[in-house]
């Protein structure tokens, strides 16, 4: 697992992006072991544009929600990313019987969907 990177230093005239991952709602949320989110920036051919980042394990699990409440800082300025890039979010958890980490679901935001403020993604 790779950790969340620190916020990059500001660059004059460039736009930096930080995304707060608050929670994910799943009907069987309490059953997932060591759940976390992986965030990756990829080009239009799904080629990684920077190293992926993993949130720490969720801070809380309830009946139908898993709470992360973590900020992820994209390490490149928006202007330096190629047209058509997207930010991918993968919900992962540990499966003890198989002794591996599994991806349960994922979603992505395309470049033209980025905006300031809250955004809910369907995974």
Q: Model segments located where?
A:
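C2/C2-like lipid-binding beta-sandwich modules
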Residues: 1-41, 74-79
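C2-type phospholipid-binding modules
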Residues: 8, 86-123
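Helix-boundary capping/turn motifs
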Residues: 10-14, 43-47, 61-66, 80-83
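Hydrophobic residues positioned within well-ordered beta-strands of beta-sheet architectures
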Residues: 17, 35-37, 70, 87, ...
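Eukaryotic short linear interaction motifs
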Residues: 26-31, 40, 44-49, 80-83, ...
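Short Trp-Ser/Thr-centered turn/loop motifs at beta-strand boundaries
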Residues: 47-63, 69, 104-106
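Low-complexity, flexible helical/coil segments
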Residues: 50-58, 73-78, 110, 123
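Eukaryote-biased detector of low-complexity, proline/serine/threonine-rich segments
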Residues: 64-101
């Amino acid at each position: 697992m790779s950790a969340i990177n620190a916020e990059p230093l500001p660059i004059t005239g460039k736009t930096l992006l930080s995304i707060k991952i608050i929670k994910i709602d799943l009907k069987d949320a309490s059953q997932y072991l060591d759940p976390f989110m992986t965030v990756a920036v990829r080009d239009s051919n799904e080629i990684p544009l920077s190293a992926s980042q993993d949130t720490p394990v969720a801070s809380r699990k309830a009946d139908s929600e898993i709470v992360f409440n973590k900020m992820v800082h994209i390490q490149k300025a928006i202007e330096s990313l190629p047209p058509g890039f997207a930010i991918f979010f993968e919900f992962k958890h540990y499966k003890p019987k198989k002794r591996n980490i599994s991806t349960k679901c994922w979603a992505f935001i395309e470049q033209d969907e980025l905006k300031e403020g809250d955004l809910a993604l369907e995974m």
